[in-house]
UniProtKB/Swiss-Prot annotation:
<feature type="binding site">
    <location>
        <position position="192"/>
    </location>
    <ligand>
        <name>phosphate</name>
    </ligand>
</feature>
<feature type="binding site">
    <location>
        <begin position="215"/>
        <end position="217"/>
    </location>
    <ligand>
        <name>substrate</name>
    </ligand>
</feature>
<keyword id="KW-0328">Glycosyltransferase</keyword>
<keyword id="KW-0660">Purine salvage</keyword>
<feature type="binding site">
    <location>
        <position position="10"/>
    </location>
    <ligand>
        <name>phosphate</name>
    </ligand>
</feature>
<protein>
    <recommendedName>
        <fullName>Probable 6-oxopurine nucleoside phosphorylase</fullName>
        <ecNumber>2.4.2.1</ecNumber>
    </recommendedName>
</protein>
<dbReference type="Pfam" id="PF01048">
    <property type="entry name" value="PNP_UDP_1"/>
</dbReference>
<dbReference type="GO" id="GO:0005829">
    <property type="term" value="C:cytosol"/>
</dbReference>
<feature type="binding site">
    <location>
        <position position="191"/>
    </location>
    <ligand>
        <name>substrate</name>
    </ligand>
</feature>
<dbReference type="InterPro" id="IPR035994">
    <property type="entry name" value="Nucleoside_phosphorylase_sf"/>
</dbReference>
<keyword id="KW-0808">Transferase</keyword>
<feature type="site" description="Important for substrate specificity">
    <location>
        <position position="228"/>
    </location>
</feature>
<comment type="pathway">
    <text>Purine metabolism; purine nucleoside salvage.</text>
</comment>
<dbReference type="GO" id="GO:0006166">
    <property type="term" value="P:purine ribonucleoside salvage"/>
</dbReference>
<dbReference type="InterPro" id="IPR010044">
    <property type="entry name" value="MTAP"/>
</dbReference>
<comment type="function">
    <text>Purine nucleoside phosphorylase which is highly specific for 6-oxopurine nucleosides. Cleaves guanosine or inosine to respective bases and sugar-1-phosphate molecules. Involved in purine salvage.</text>
</comment>
<comment type="subunit">
    <text>Homohexamer. Dimer of a homotrimer.</text>
</comment>
Length: 270
């Protein structure tokens, strides 16, 4: 059993010690998972965009990725994302631990439970139309608390809380869209947070995210033209902090789950 899984992108490929690649065939496609050691335990890592970072956000096979971790009996997932700042107070370089999200994607496969597919969760079959709750916590409170505690231990400043807005991509958002997201209460905007978080909940897996602000979103604080190079540059500067933060977080995550995430399917697993 692998207790903790990590989903991330560039810069984290060398995170694990003694890594090996395992290909898992899921009902939703295959997934290459890197298994290795971190913080004294075996950990699974999935490069969200593929090993060569070839998949755009809307083509990522989120269901295969999450189900592969389910097959490994992962209970906790720590994810990382690069985000733009909707809230002017969140400067580039800020690390945000979001507490909620708004899903503005349009054409992604967002659920395991389409009424026809049967899947296994903790060795038990689940099928039909399943409606999981995203309240009272959208992201796992135990992982979030562990991330924040780890950051405090490191002396690393993080923003506790924020609303993540997920867009389809590949283009960056328009100034009008960002104004609309701000009115809706959004703080940061990215392209990979959904449906990842809700799919984890559908598998009763705890999930939380570490979001790195790489730029101001369109029209915020004078932002004019956004470039992918800008995003990569800022994220690369923070990769050492993020890597250490993940390791310190794993050391602090409780071995026994007491959060509501574990009971997400309780009414369906009878």
């Amino acid at each position: 059993m692998v207790r903790v899984g990590i989903i991330g992108g560039s810069g984290l490929y060398e995170l694990l010690e003694n890594p090996r690649i395992v290909r898992l065939d899921t009902p939703f496609g295959h997934c290459d998972v890197q298994l290795g050691e971190l913080a004294g335990e075996e950990v699974a890592f999935i490069p969200r965009h593929g090993a060569s970072h070839r998949l755009p956000p809307y083509k990522v096979n989120y269901k295969a990725n999450l189900y592969a971790l389910n097959m490994l009996e992962v209970e906790r997932i720590i994810a990382t994302n690069a985000v733009g700042s909707i809230n002017p107070a969140l400067e580039p370089g800020t690390i945000v631990i979001p507490h909620d999200f708004i899903d503005m994607t349009k054409c992604r496969d967002v659920t395991f439970y389409d009424g026809e597919t049967t899947i296994k969760v903790r060795g038990r079959e689940v099928s039909g139309v399943v409606h999981v709750s995203m309240t009272p916590y959208t992201y796992c409170p135990e992982i979030r608390a562990s991330i924040i505690e780890a950051a405090e231990h490191m002396g690393l400043g993080v923003r506790d809380g924020g609303v993540y807005v997920c867009t389809e991509g590949n283009r960056f958002e328009t100034p009008a869209e960002i104004r609309a997201f701000s009115i809706l209460g959004g703080d940061i905007v990215g392209m990979t947070g959904c449906p990842e978080a809700s799919l984890a909940r559908e598998l009763a897996i705890c999930y939380a995210s570490i979001s790195v602000v790489t730029n101001y979103a369109a029209g915020v604080s004078g932002a004019v033209k956004l470039t992918q190079g800008e995003v990569i540059e800022i994220f690369s500067r923070k990769i050492q902090d993020i890597s250490r933060l993940i390791e310190e977080t794993i050391r602090r995550i409780p071995k026994r789950r007491e959060c509501p995430c574990k009971d997400a399917l309780s009414e369906y697993l009878k």
